[in-house]
Swiss-Prot record:
Localization of this protein: Cytoplasm
Protein name as annotated: 16S rRNA aminocarboxypropyltransferase
Pfam families: Fer4_RLI, Ribo_biogen_C
The family this protein is said to belong to: Belongs to the TDD superfamily. TSR3 family.
GO molecular function (one): 18S rRNA aminocarboxypropyltransferase activity
Keywords noted in UniProt: Cytoplasm, Ribosome biogenesis, rRNA processing, S-adenosyl-L-methionine, Transferase
HAMAP family tied to this protein: TSR3
Catalytic activity: an N(1)-methylpseudouridine in rRNA + S-adenosyl-L-methionine = N(1)-methyl-N(3)-[(3S)-3-amino-3-carboxypropyl]pseudouridine in rRNA + S-methyl-5'-thioadenosine + H(+)
Organism for this UniProt entry: Methanocaldococcus jannaschii (strain ATCC 43067 / DSM 2661 / JAL-1 / JCM 10045 / NBRC 100440)
Binding site for S-adenosyl-L-methionine: 21, 71, 93, 112
Signal sequence residues: none
Disulfide links within the chain: none
C-alpha cells in the first residue's frame, strides 16, 4: 500500500474546470482542495516557480511531515499570486518539460498534477509519483519524457546540486 504524502491545492478558480488537473485530483481523493489561501498548512512545502531555492531530495522530511502545497492559478496570474502570499518552505522545481495537453512540450509550464508528480519523484517518493499518473491518461508520459532529469535530480545531495544538474543539462 502506497502512503502518499498529503497534497494540498489552493485553487484560485482561474482555469477551465473540465481541463483542471487540480479539481480531478481532489475528486479522486488524491489531494485536498483549499478555497482560501490562508488555510494553506504553514509548514508544508510550497511549490513556487519563483522561489529562490530549488526542490531537492533534502526536502523529503518536510514533505513527509507536512505535505506539499501547490497554488493552482493561471500562468498569467502566477507571479502576482506568489508575491501576494508569503509562505515558509517555498521551493521551485528545476527544468522539466510539460506533457499536459495545454502546454505540451513547453519547458517549465507544468500543470498542478505534473508539479506534484515532479516534487514527489525528486524527493524520492517515486512510487507515489507513479501512482498520481493514474489521474490522467497523459500523465505517465510526463515521467517518461523527463525520466533522465527526474532521476538525476532525485539523486542530488541538495538544492545547489539540483541547480548544477539543471545548468549542465541546459548547456548541452
Amino acid at each position: 500500500m502506497i502512503t502518499m504524502p498529503k497534497l494540498f491545492i489552493y485553487h484560485a478558480n482561474q482555469c477551465n474546470p473540465k481541463k483542471c488537473t487540480s479539481l480531478k485530483m481532489a475528486k479522486m481523493n488524491k489531494a485536498i482542495l483549499l478555497k482560501n489561501p490562508y488555510k494553506v498548512p504553514k509548514n508544508s512545502l510550497i511549490l513556487n516557480p519563483y522561489a529562490e531555492k530549488a526542490l531537492s531530495p533534502e526536502d523529503k522530511e518536510i514533505v513527509e511531515k507536512f505535505g506539499i502545497t501547490a497554488l493552482d492559478c493561471s500562468w498569467k496570474e502566477a507571479e502576482l499570486m506568489f508575491k501576494k502570499f508569503k509562505f515558509k518552505n517555498q521551493r521551485s522545481l528545476p527544468f522539466l518539460v510539460a506533457c499536459n495537453p495545454i502546454n505540451y512540450g513547453k519547458p517549465c509550464m507544468l500543470s498542478t498534477l505534473e508539479a506534484f508528480i515532479a516534487a514527489l519523484y525528486i524527493t524520492n517518493f517515486k512510487d507515489e509519483a507513479w501512482d498520481l499518473t493514474s489521474c490522467f491518461k497523459w500523465a505517465e508520459t510526463f515521467i517518461k519524457v523527463n525520466y533522465e532529469l527526474l532521476e538525476r535530480y532525485s539523486n542530488a545531495k541538495n538544492s545547489m546540486e539540483v541547480v548544477e544538474i539543471q545548468q549542465d543539462f541546459l548547456r548541452k
